[in-house]
Design a protein with these regions (language model features):
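Active-site groove signature of glycoside hydrolases
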Residues: 128-148
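Beta/alpha (TIM)-barrel catalytic core signal, keyed to glycine-rich beta->alpha loops juxtaposed to Asp/Glu
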Residues: 3-14, 148-333
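Hydrophobic faces of well-ordered beta-strands that scaffold small-molecule active sites
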Residues: 30-34, 64-66, 96-100, 139-141, ...
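Short, acidic/polar
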Residues: 43-56, 115-131, 179-183
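N-terminal binding-site loop/beta-alpha segment at the start of enzyme catalytic domains
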Residues: 1-96
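Alpha-helix N-cap and loop-to-helix initiation/capping positions
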Residues: 44-48, 76, 80, 111-119, ...
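Structural motif
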Residues: 55, 59, 130-131, 164, ...
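N-terminal small/glycine-rich loop or linker at the start of catalytic domains
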Residues: 23-41, 99-112, 135, 140
Length: 333
């Protein structure tokens, strides 16, 4: 990484990135966005984080997705982004679309989690300070809170927009009935619910099965997919066993029990199809999501610049023949 002043690539908007409209709004988002859930915390190299963020923006990624608890440790991904915002991205602030969220465990006590007015307001104030920002482009309710009146959560989102702390709001991982109420409430209060963010990949089809994709579209909202590679399962990482440095080997979110023999055989067959298409399994998995007309953007993580570059190759072929789609369906039955 050079210590020289960062200058964004002149061809960043002509290097192959596709920009898609978020629902019925005026906002265009890159087909691939960069998420900072892991690999950007205080346990990671600031220099490597800077290189990845620079590479992303230089290649047309304008949307950076964060949350208050991203790291590890919680809050450190926003601090990392804030440092890079100050040293590199400040001249380009108006070209960036920055999101953050609140709703998961963040600090001790009864006000450090879920969807109360107190938690959401305090959390966003903390996030803005960590990221060296006056406002975020979109602020999400990170998860539905069954214990807080939904109207309280939603009115807080409305007030956050009116206070100028966020330009837009969104919801993440809301069940369909709660999402229906959220869309209606926000519309009645003249605030755009710009995006629904949900887990969606070849192995998890809930947004289709539960009607979440269609519901978002009918309410004028875009859909952003996270975990598009199923935390690494939809890559070549596990085709020949479990590497010692993999997420499964380390434990945590992805358990060894998740990779059953049946699932492994499905992944192997998907990999063969990807090879026939001239793609890696990861590229095909991203391309499959991007082929869906109701998907606005797909959020990828990145442990390295090389991994991010590989993910961007998915944009080179997002077309699937009817036969290929049928083959995928047959594999995953």
């Amino acid at each position: 990484m050079s210590d020289s002043v960062y200058q964004a690539a002149n061809n960043r908007y002509t290097c192959g990135m596709d920009y898609r409209r978020a629902g019925k709004s005026s906002i265009l988002l890159p087909a691939i966005s960069l998420g900072l859930w892991h690999n950007f915390g205080d346990v990671d190299s600031l220099a490597r984080s800077k290189d990845k963020l620079h590479y992303a923006f230089d290649h047309g990624i304008t949307h950076f997705d964060l949350a208050n608890n991203y790291g590890p440790s919680a809050g450190s991904a926003e601090e990392t982004f804030g440092k890079i915002m100050k040293t590199s991205f400040a001249p380009y602030r108006d070209e960036l679309f920055v999101s953050t969220k609140a709703g998961h465990d963040m600090w001790p006590g009864p006000y450090g989690t879920w969807g109360s007015r107190k938690h959401l307001t305090a959390s966003l104030n903390q996030s803005l300070k960590r990221m060296n920002l006056d406002y975020v482009d979109i602020f999400y309710s990170h998860r539905y809170d069954p214990e807080t009146p939904l109207e309280e959560t939603l009115q807080t989102l409305v007030d956050i927009v009116r206070q100028g702390k966020a330009l837009y709001v969104g919801i993440s991982k809301y069940p369909p009935e709660a999402a229906r109420k959220a869309y209606a409430y926000l519309k009645d209060h003249d605030v755009i619910c710009l995006l629904y963010q949900g887990r969606y990949n070849l192995l998890n089809r809930e947004p289709e099965e539960q009607g979440i994709l269609q519901q978002a579209a009918e309410n004028g909202s875009g859909f952003v997919a996270f975990s598009p590679l199923a935390q690494g399962l939809l890559t070549n990482r596990y085709l020949k066993g479990i590497p010692e440095d993999s997420r499964i080997a380390r434990g945590g979110f992805l358990k060894k029990e998740a990779l059953t023999e049946d699932l492994l055989q499905k992944i192997i067959r998907l990999d063969r199809l990807a090879c026939e298409r001239g793609q890696s399994l990861a590229e095909m998995s991203l391309a499959w999501l991007l082929a869906h007309p109701l998907v606005t953007s797909v959020i990828v993580g990145a442990s390295s610049v090389e991994q991010l570059a590989d993910n961007l190759k998915a944009l080179e072929n997002i077309s699937f023949s009817q036969e290929e789609q049928q083959t995928i369906q047959a594999i995953l039955q």
